[in-house]
Amino acid sequence: MKHVLSIQSHVVYGYAGNKSATFPMQLLGVDVWALNTVQFSNHTQYGKWTGMVIPKEQIGEIVRGIDAIEALHLCDAIVSGYIGSAEQVEEIVNAVRFIKSKNPNALYLCDPVMGHPDKGCIVAEGVKEGLINLAMAEADLITPNLVELRELSGLPVENFAQAQDAVRAILAKGPKKVLVKHLSKVGKDSSQFEMLLATKDGMWHISRPLHQFRKEPVGVGDLTAGLFIANLLNGKSDIEAFEHTANAVNDVMTVTQQKDNYELQIIAAREYIMQPSSQYKAVKIA
């Protein structure tokens, strides 16, 4: 069994951060160690919430606590998602380095949560800079959306060709794999939901239906990152992991749309997470 330390937000009600990622990874047979960066009543897109950002010291303390019981070397991957403060970025990077000193084969997937194409950058002051200057160089895999693709690459991204250039620029900065979770308005077809995967071996594009909602569900990127790393840990190739992730997420979105719900219907769609009914294929473009 593979083990993942998932350092993300937690919501008591609904699905975002670790609530979106943990159960799907477990469904794929991965043991998840959930370490929460915030604990909120619900996700922030409701416009009101209660809760707190977890003190930065707790991240390192918890990781050292796992090491104290001689279990840290079992960690096969670290996932970081929504980060509540700039100080947490440094703590997470230190934790990644410490874990890799115990298990040099451990992977670090950085989901560089900064914002949304329609909302801009919405994280706390200093988080964006920490992700760009610290986390990206440590990451083996990174999973930006359109906003994050622009910020991480430092390049304008207004069309499909520029998106490919930005992905190549990020690869040159350290990560071995770049998964663009959603190309949004710079994809090839605005009526579709499009993703990119780039490695040293090339670049692949996948397109699936763009589901319409009265209110767009939150947590899709967290689900995507979790499924991708779980598939890789289970021995799937990059392309197999990419396709399974895209298809499973599409099925979750279909079930969520059918139930007309603002929250991702992860439990209702659990069978599709394990065995997607969608069969969209990745196409090599470079």
Curated annotation (Swiss-Prot):
GO biological process: pyridoxal 5'-phosphate salvage
Function, as annotated: Pyridoxal kinase involved in the salvage pathway of pyridoxal 5'-phosphate (PLP). Catalyzes the phosphorylation of pyridoxal to PLP.
Assembly mode: Homodimer.
Catalytic activity: pyridoxal + ATP = pyridoxal 5'-phosphate + ADP + H(+)
Protein name (Swiss-Prot/TrEMBL): Pyridoxal kinase PdxY
Signal peptide (from-to): none
Cellular component, GO annotation: cytosol
Record key words, sorted: ATP-binding, Kinase, Magnesium, Nucleotide-binding, Transferase
Entry-linked InterPro entries: PM/HMP-P_kinase-1, PyrdxlKinase, Pyridoxal_kinase_PdxY, Ribokinase-like
CDD domains recorded: pyridoxal_pyridoxamine_kinase
Cystine residue pairs: none
Superkingdom as given in the UniProt entry: Bacteria
Pathway noted in the entry: Cofactor metabolism; pyridoxal 5'-phosphate salvage; pyridoxal 5'-phosphate from pyridoxal: step 1/1
Family membership: Belongs to the pyridoxine kinase family. PdxY subfamily.
NCBIfam families given in the database record: PRK05756.1, pyridox_kin
Any GO molecular function: ATP binding
Cofactor: Mg(2+)
Binding site for substrate: 9, 44-45, 222
Listed EC numbers: 2.7.1.35
Amino acids binding ATP: 111, 148, 181
